[in-house]
Amino acid sequence: MATLFIADLHLQTEEPAIVAGFLRFLAVEARQADALYILGDLFEAWIGDDDPNPLHREIAAAIKAVVNVGVPCFFIHGNRDFLIGKRFARESGMILLPQEKVLDLYGRNVLIMHGDTLCTDDAGYQAFRAKVHNPWVQRLFLTLPLFIRRRIAARMRAGSKAANSSKSLDIMDVNAQTVVAEMEKHRVQWLIHGHTHRPAVHELSANDQPAFRVVLGAWHHEGSMVKVTPDNVELIAFPL
């Protein structure tokens, strides 16, 4: 019995080794799990479910194959793929979840999320996030021709990279008070998230009790997953 969590794969055709590693993960580890949760940034960018990129179809088919053998797959949007919609969910068999979700995992209540909403010290990013998550802005963007959407997405990624290069690492990490507030709001002692690309298990106090924040790593030269069993919560790095 095990439930698996992954995040921040940033899949793109320019990184075939990561794509191949994820396909192997789906073919082996994922099929042995009780469930698979993908906590955002599965793709490096997403400009709409109507994008004919062959990689998207390949990944959808591979996830659907896992679902078809009886392993449910769930998805929380990240900051790179927040426009993944019902069409891709249907093609992949994934169940779309809200940005925060509490799970009962073998007797533990665990809060899961992508993690960008915890980085409240980065006021510039939070303001940008509020704009692009406006439903009207998203609807307008999705009405644009694909070639224009690609240009806008490329420009936004370049702008984000430039902005992040001038920010301190502390600003781009989670805010400790925000973490505690979220865990106490949901009355949990466990939090699993991604986004920061800083894999670790942090001990803290929430609800006047010991608590744990487990941060998934990004997939680069190795993969990263959290494996939750009735007896343990493990952060695992593995070769791709």
From Swiss-Prot:
Disulfide bonds: none annotated. Binds 2 Mn(2+) ions per subunit in a binuclear metal center. Its cofactor is Mn(2+). Gene3D superfamilies: 3.60.21.10. InterPro entries: Calcineurin-like_PHP_ApaH, LpxH-like, Metallo-depent_PP-like, UDP-diacylglucosamine_Hdrlase. SUPFAM superfamilies: Metallo-dependent phosphatases (SSF56300). It is a peripheral membrane protein. Its main location: membrane. One of its GO terms (cellular component) is cytoplasm. This is UDP-2,3-diacylglucosamine hydrolase.
